[in-house]
């Protein structure tokens, strides 16, 4: 199977790198803008799961495993769905730009997922989802004065 180009979403936040790193690695912070994670530890080998909703309200159990952690720089985890073939990888990379932080999210391997009737695993859906999550959810969270 030909591997598609990864999805890449980049945004610069008016927030220090420590705040952005905590937002993507602390489960209590993540619940405020990302998904409702029961547990999360930024440690290689740590497995976590959460439910996400499909286009028609279907619940998909996401199964993830932390692959790589470079504190305040990089976080990679696998991303797959319970009961479906395929595996993908999500990477968050952080770059300090003065008192701002540039985040680069890449998601690769999503083409290994099956085609569903509602195209829940289509590249366009992932792009739309990540654009909202990174461009709106995370931005609003880290740029708030007190959270």
Region spans (language model):
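Residue-level preference for beta-strand/loop junctions
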Residues: 4-5, 44, 58, 86
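Hydrophobic pocket/interface hotspot
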Residues: 20, 30, 48-50, 66, ...
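Aromatic-glycine hotspot motif
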Residues: 1-13, 17, 95-106, 139-140
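A conserved amphipathic terminal alpha-helix motif
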Residues: 102, 109-147
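Hydrophobic ligand-binding cavity/cleft-lining segments
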Residues: 1-39
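Generic structural detector for well-ordered beta-strands
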Residues: 8-14, 41, 49, 65, ...
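A short gly/proline-enriched turn/hairpin at secondary-structure junctions
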Residues: 7, 31-38, 50-56, 78-80
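Hydrophobic-ligand binding "helix-grip"
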Residues: 39, 56-102, 108-112
